[in-house]
Amino acid sequence: MNVKKKFEKNIFTEVIEDKPPKNQTEKEENINNEINNNKEQNENKIDIIKGKSSEDIKNSQKNQKIVKKIKEISSQDFISIEELRNICWKGIPSEDPLIRAECWKILLGLYPLKKELKNSVIQRKKDEYLDMCNVYSNALKNPEEVMNEEELKIYRQIQKDNPRTMPESSLFQNNKIQYMLTRVLYIWSLRHPASGYVQGFNDLCIPFFIVYFLEKFPEKNIDTILKLDENEFKKLSEDTLTEIETTIYFSLTKLLDRIQTNYTINQPGITKMIKKMELIVEKVDPKLYEYLKKFEIDYVQFCFRWMNCFLIREFPVKLILRLWDAYFSEEKGFSEFHLYVCACLLLTFSEKLKAMTEFQELIVFLQNLPTANWTIEDMDMLLAKSYSIKVLYSNSIILKSDGKNQ
């Protein structure tokens, strides 16, 4: 991503619409402007009547422009991935659920950049996943009889973890969803023996389920899709459910392919990430670093979960989707940029932490950060600060972590 370009423009700058054609007469232009202004004013009045604040209206108009720009980019015969990354980094508006689903599939590499290949790729992926389902069908129906000891161990752990996946959500507690989640995780684990199943994989599937189910229920929002009831669920055909499950499987695969050493034996990738995060904190806020060191705070005690589940358990779902918009838009979003986000999250509470005087007080706070009431604006600010830190310190952090002279 072009750093200079990103800093020259505020990362939250609105997308400017195209100018009208040059051959348009001044009279026609004035008439069109008047019509558009009246239309916009009327829409604003309606929004105010509905109880929306002027800030809400402004954000809505900005989001509409972003959606329009994303649609323009994604409708090209050959999609400019750099353009798409730049716009999605700022946050994909939730008003149109189809947009986020489409963008994630492109950014993950599930969809080809060449538009004419899209349908054939989708069908090939679907056929491939159905073949895998057929291979493991008998085992999943009769686990005790068909699976060997190692497979049964994986299956039982998945069965144990899945009911804990958003237990307050009727969507995730639906029996069909539980089976879909089990099948996705079991097939992935058996096809990736280097890591197998690791606790937390069920959490990594949460954003994908929400985004791809919203795609099929565009009239809903993040909160209402989590409350999807049995009658609404039954509206989806088996073919549609297979399509969703296929997309979730390959999305998880694309994500884990980027960070697989996080989940191999002894999880060396996570150990390395935690060490790098510690170096970032030392560089950016040496006073906080020394303060935590004085109390012998081990970063593993509080941020292992941050690395293992990519902050899914630390923030409300809508903020995780916003966070992952940025991660998918970064070339090394999960393996590198995530470290700066985690460090910046810790630095956000620097003064509070330095005011604490007991080890137990510190560790309890670090394991339960007060982020439940954070807003999208708070997440935007966290991402902006994280990016600034990355630009300013990334070279020296990498050199130090590699054991070289700075």
Predicted ranges, named:
Residues D56-K65, E230-Q301, K332-Q406:
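Extended, Lys/Glu/Leu-rich amphipathic alpha-helical scaffolds
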Residues M1-A194, C205, F209-L241, K400-Q406:
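N-terminal transition regions in large eukaryotic proteins
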Residues K115-E116, F217, N221, I265, ...:
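Intrinsically disordered, low-complexity regions enriched in proline, serine, glycine
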Residues V15, K69-E72, I87, I106, ...:
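Alpha-helical recognition domains of nuclear gene-regulatory proteins
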Residues I312-K318, F328:
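Extended serine/threonine-enriched, polar tracts that run as long, contiguous segments within proteins
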Residues N59-K69, S80-L84, E95, I99-R100, ...:
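Alpha-helical interaction elements in eukaryotic regulators
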Residues E116-L117, V121-S169, I244-F302, W306:
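Aromatic-anchored, charged helix-turn/loop surface patch used as a conserved interaction hotspot
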Residues L321, D325:
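Glycine-rich ThDP/TPP pyrophosphate-binding loop and its adjacent helix/strand module
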